[in-house]
Amino acid sequence: MSKFWSPAVRELTPYVPGEQPRERLIKLNTNENPYPPAPGVEQVLREFPVDHLRLYPDPSATALREALAETYDVATEQVFVGNGSDEVLALAFQAFFRQSRPLLMPAISYSFYPVYCKLYDVAYRSVALDDQWRVPLTAFDTDNGGIVFANPNAPTGHGHSRDAIAALLERNTESVVLVDEAYVDFGGESAVPLVERFPNLLVTGTFSKSRSLAGLRLGYAIGSRELIEGLERVKDSFNSFPIDRITIDAGIAALHDRAYFEACRERVITTRERTRQRLESLGFEVMPSQSNFLFVRHETYEGRAIFGELRERGILVRHFDKEALSDFLRISIGTEDEMDSLIEALEAVCR
């Protein structure tokens, strides 16, 4: 604590990201894509004219927003972009959720949500997951100043159908419903087609997972024009140039190579299902997943103990200190070779 900190900063409990090791480890703890970005991204990086870096980027990132609009079949005016989906989410919390009524969110979900609430003085209420570790959408049918949830959820991996989200929106018309789709490309069903019917729906996404661009920081939101205008007002009161020139061009290149995107996505899904079966044969309970990770617990061994044993063997997975999750591990899907190494290590640990 410093005497120079404001009282609000003293009260913060910051988000703790997954470990980013300096030594060479098999890294299955932060849900990064195991495959490189599309070849067009590498071409952008190799051929980018360095002299252009002396110029500010387009503050609206119009070309990138146009590419996203084409990809998702919406108008350019319905697209917002930011420096990673974390920034997009942070701006959305400021723009829409500082209300007299509480924001509703799952008790177990992306742990940045309560951090934003504390930072921006957003009143919120957590909703417990059901006995199958699913977000209970009907539990959001109470008086609220907004609803936010990840679909598929993290760290559990379960995703709701588009019809289920539409039913939620039919019942909640007076506040913003934010659906965080960071993992939707690995088997979930996107809510983006619903934005034409529901002006209070905001869908956020990221290039970090299915597009392999975690190192460049690029996220987006899709919604009604009035919601996008609200995000722009907050952004332009904070940072008018959140996306640099290289990232704009790289993002466009990633979007244009649909075949590469589909191939990588299918590889991750195939490896996930193969890994699920192998984990179950070792005595793990594996939650159904529509994401690029598996949420698991062993019938005998404690999660923390397995986490430590794997780390000693050079493999990082994610363990959460939260009491309700202490028996669980979240395992990112890596390459086939990386998952083979994981299974080999677990065979030794859980013998």
Curated annotation (Swiss-Prot):
Catalytic reaction annotation: L-histidinol phosphate + 2-oxoglutarate = 3-(imidazol-4-yl)-2-oxopropyl phosphate + L-glutamate
Pathway participation: Amino-acid biosynthesis; L-histidine biosynthesis; L-histidine from 5-phospho-alpha-D-ribose 1-diphosphate: step 7/9
Taxonomic superkingdom: Bacteria
Database matches in PROSITE patterns: AA_TRANSFER_CLASS_2
GO BP terms: L-histidine biosynthetic process
Cofactor(s), by name: pyridoxal 5'-phosphate
Any one GO MF annotation of this record: histidinol-phosphate transaminase activity
EC number: 2.6.1.9
InterPro entries in the record: Aminotrans_II_pyridoxalP_BS (IPR001917), Aminotransferase_I/II_large (IPR004839), HisP_aminotrans (IPR005861), HistidinolP_aminotransfase (IPR050106), PyrdxlP-dep_Trfase (IPR015424), PyrdxlP-dep_Trfase_major (IPR015421), PyrdxlP-dep_Trfase_small (IPR015422)
Subunit structure: Homodimer.
Protein name: Histidinol-phosphate aminotransferase
Gene source species: Chromohalobacter salexigens (strain ATCC BAA-138 / DSM 3043 / CIP 106854 / NCIMB 13768 / 1H11)
Lineage summary: Bacteria, Pseudomonadati, Pseudomonadota, Gammaproteobacteria, Oceanospirillales
